[in-house]
Each structure stands twice: as C-alpha cells, then as structure tokens.
Amino acid sequence: MAENAGNETKLVENENLQEDLSRLNLEDEKNELKLNEKGGVLKENDEHLECSESFKKLAEKEEAYQTLKNSYNSLKQQHSNLLGKVSGIKSTLGERLKKDSQELAQNRKRIQELEKSLGDAEEALKLSNEETVTLTAQVESLTQDITDLRQQNASLVEENQLLSTQSKQWERRARDEHEMQESLAVRLADCEEQLARETERQEQYEVEIQRHLTNQHQLEIELESTKASHTENLGELTRNWQKAMDDVTEKFASKSKEYEDLQNELDATQKRLSRVSDLEHEVKEKTLLIGKLQHEAVVLNEHLTKALCMLKDGNNAEKIDKQLISNLFVSFLTLPRADTKRFEILQLISSVLDWNDTQREQTGLQRPGSSVNNWSIPHSASSNSLFSDHSFSKRRSFHDS
C-alpha cells in the first residue's frame, strides 16, 4: 500500500510538470503574437507620420518597442532556460517513469499476490466465523447446562437444609420420647409402690372390717345378754353401732374406688410403656436431660414431702411452712398462664391451707356443687409424682402433635 501511494505521488508530480511546460509554451506564443502586432503598428505609423509629433511618437514607440524587445529577449532567455529545465526534467522524468513503471508492474504483481492472500484470508475468516457460530452455540448450551446445574445445586442445598431441620426435629422428638419414657418408668414405679401401699391398706381395712364385724358380733351378743336390763340404752347403742358400720362401709367404698382408679391408671401406664417400647429404637442414641425441670421437680418434691409429712402429723395439722407457701406462690406467679403446672401448684396450696369449698370455687379449683374429694391431693407417692405427671403431659402433647 505504501508503494502504491508513492507511485501515485510520482504520477501526480509528472502531470504537474507537464502542465507547467504547456503553460510556458502558451505564454511564449502569446508574447510572439504581441510583438508581431506591435511591429505592424509601428510600420504603419512610420508611413503616415509626417510631423515632429509623429517623430516624437515614433521615438516613443521605438523606445517602447525596444523595451518590449528587451522584455521579449528576457522572456526568450527565460524560455530557453525553461526548455533546458524541461529537457532535464524530461530526461529525469523518463528515467523516473521507467523506474516507476517497473515499480508499478512489481506493485501490481504484489497487489495480485496480496489480493490472493486477501481472498485466502477472507476464506479463512469465513471458516473462522462459522467456527465462531458453532462455538457460540456450544457456549450457550454450556451456559444453559451451568444454569441448570446451579438450579439443581440450589435445590439440593435447600433440600439439605430441610432434611437438616427435619433431623433436628426428629432428634428433639427422640429426646422428648426418651424423657417421656423415663418419666413413665418413674411414674410406673410410683404407681406400683402406691398400689402396694393401697393393697396393704386394703388388707388393713379388711382386717379392720373383720375386727368391726367381730366387735359387732360381740356387741350383738352383749346386746342380747343385756337387752332385758339395758332396754333404755338400746337406742343409743343401736345408733352407735349403725354409725360405726356406716363409717366403715364408707371408708371401704372410698378405698375400693381409689384401688380401682389406681388399677386403671396402672393399666393405662402399662399401655403407654408398651407404646414407648415400640419407639425405643428411634430414641436409642438421642438422650438429653432437662436440668431446669429436674431441679424444680427436686425442690418442689422436697417441699411436697415436707408438707405431706406435716399433713400426716395429726398434732401439727394447723402448722404451715411459710417457706413452702412462699415458694409455691413464687412458682405459681412466675409460670406462664398456659402452663398446667399452675393448676397443680394451686391444688397443693389449697391442700396445705385447707381451703373450704367456697374458696376452691372462687379460685377455680372446684365447680359449684362438686365434691371436695374430686380435687383432693393424693398421698405421698402420687404427690411426689405431681410434676412428673405434668412433664409427661407436656411431652405427650408434643408427641401427638
């Protein structure tokens, strides 16, 4: 490309030189015509001028002619110089033109080679464009695959998080089931112990009933033997006997009902334990103790034991442990309103303070017209398991949910 530009520049210079040469030739021809015209005019003036003025004018004309001739000679000299320069330029330009023509031929050959190379390059470019289109399609396909993989990765991460959450929930449920199992085991032991005590009491009541029956029989014998002499005391003895029999019958019925309730509770507990044994494989390696509830249970059980010991003591029936009542009231006020332990603590307070039916109805522990015995606190074994029952009820509600 640079050689082509150099050749074009040389051609333009040659054309400019030829134009200058043509212009100089035209100027020479014009000057010769002017001199010829002026010479003819002078000749005519020489023939017609007859006076001095004519000579004067002729002198002036001659002077002007001389000036023009000098100018012509000067121009002719310049023309000769220019012709010499033109000859030199022509010789120089001939060599340059010959050289330029050779260079032009070489450049044309070079241009042909370059055009051929350009065609090859265009063909290669076309192939490259086709390959680029193919690669672009492959890149788009790979980009789509990457997008799909990222979406799958995000879905897998979300699923992993969900599985982790479910695993934590199952672990928490397993811990609760294990704790419920331990609570049921403790409660079962308490129920068995209470059942043994109630059985022993039942036997004692049967012995007492038998003793009362024996006394009744003895009283009947004594009544028969002393009927004649103690007729006036017959009515009183009969009433005393009937009252004693009613008391014994009432106590026997109450204890029988308590025995049946304990038996039903024991059966229900055994069913729960059988159900817990089915879930034991899920909670085998997932155990965690709730220290706070255990601590509260220990403290409250100590106070319950102390309170029940005081209740058993007939001579100190009117004495109240202020520390126990204070702790119970603090626990009642600090627990949430929805916590069932509040109701159990209120029951314990009512038992310790020996509230009447009106007070129980005012605090919501007893419905109007219902019996006090329905809300009474059992003896030591069931009282000790009070908060264990509460913990079990909470865990069972969580398991059912």
From Swiss-Prot:
Disulfide cysteine pairs (residue numbers): none
Family matches, as PROSITE patterns: GRIP
Record GO biological process: endoplasmic reticulum to Golgi vesicle-mediated transport; Golgi organization
Chief location category: Golgi
GO annotation, cellular component aspect: Golgi apparatus; Golgi lumen
Segments forming domain GRIP: 315-366
Annotated keywords: Coiled coil, ER-Golgi transport, Golgi apparatus, Transport
Designated name of the protein: GRIP domain-containing protein C119.12
Organism: Schizosaccharomyces pombe (strain 972 / ATCC 24843)
